């Protein structure tokens, strides 16, 4: 039974489908040049989520962010952050950056569904970019995001490519996240760091879709 796009949107917003596509995440909070903050949630195994840290390591709770996350998520540790940013040309495992829709986050069912398949079935690393103010990310500036705001995605893609120059980077954007991704690709043109991208359910005429 089809009740139209508005009803579909309301139903998907009301139902989070928490019993399906269960995943664990490690969160890295990114601080940009303008002091804005966004969060990258990396899909991880349960063993990785609950692993015992060494004596010289500790969980890094970023300044201005909430100290307690949902039970299926934790912050990166100090050593994990250092390791992630360390340049390593030997890493060739593909990574997918996922961009959620308006007011979404890594907790959305559509994000968890595709992330679970890519991570568990195909062996991709998956990182969900929670936009400023989304997914329990605390705002550190008055600036939010919109379909034309590609700065944060560009920063993430460039950072990954600089650390892992031989690693294929893919991206998938849903709804508003797809618009951000499409604009980023258009702006970067031949300089785009992405190997491939997919845009799902995005409005092409934002004014007409309002």
Say what each PLM segment does.
Residues 33, 41-45, 99-102, 129-132, ...:
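Structured beta-strand/turn binding interfaces of compact recognition modules in eukaryotic regulators
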Residues 45-139, 159-162:
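Short, surface-exposed "cap/lid" segments of acyl-processing enzymes
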Residues 102-105, 140-151, 171:
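Alpha-helix capping and helix-loop boundary segments enriched in small/acidic/polar residues
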Residues 1-37, 44-57:
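N-terminal targeting or regulatory segments adjacent to alpha/beta-hydrolase or S9 domains
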Residues 40, 96-99, 114, 126-129, ...:
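Structural signal for hydrophobic/aromatic residues that build the beta-strand cores
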Residues 26, 34-38, 92-95, 122-127, ...:
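Core residues of folded domains in eukaryotic genome-function proteins
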Residues 162-210:
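Alpha/beta-hydrolase-fold enzymes
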Residues 142-164, 183:
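Alpha/beta-hydrolase active-site loop
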């Amino acid at each position: 039974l089809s009740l139209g796009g508005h009803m579909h949107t309301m139903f998907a917003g009301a139902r989070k489908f928490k019993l399906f596509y269960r995943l664990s995440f490690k969160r890295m909070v990114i601080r940009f040049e303008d002091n804005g903050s966004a969060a990258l949630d990396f899909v991880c195994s349960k063993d990785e989520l609950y692993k015992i840290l060494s004596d010289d390591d500790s969980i890094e709770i970023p300044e201005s962010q909430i100290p307690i996350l949902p039970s299926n998520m934790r912050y990166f540790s100090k050593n994990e952050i250092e390791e992630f940013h360390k340049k390593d040309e030997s890493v060739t495992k593909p990574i997918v950056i996922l961009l959620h829709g308006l007011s979404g986050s890594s907790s959305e069912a559509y994000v968890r569904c595709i992330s679970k398949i890519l991570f568990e079935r195909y062996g991709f690393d998956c990182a969900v970019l929670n936009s400023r103010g989304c997914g329990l990310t605390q705002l550190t500036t008055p600036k939010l995001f919109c379909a034309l705001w590609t700065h944060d995605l560009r920063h993430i893609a460039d950072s990954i490519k600089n650390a892992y120059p031989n690693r294929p980077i893919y991206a998938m954007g849903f709804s508003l996240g797809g618009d951000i991704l499409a604009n980023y690709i258009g702006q970067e043109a031949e300089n785009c760091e992405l190997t491939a991208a997919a845009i799902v359910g995005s409005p092409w005429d934002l004014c007409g879709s309002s």
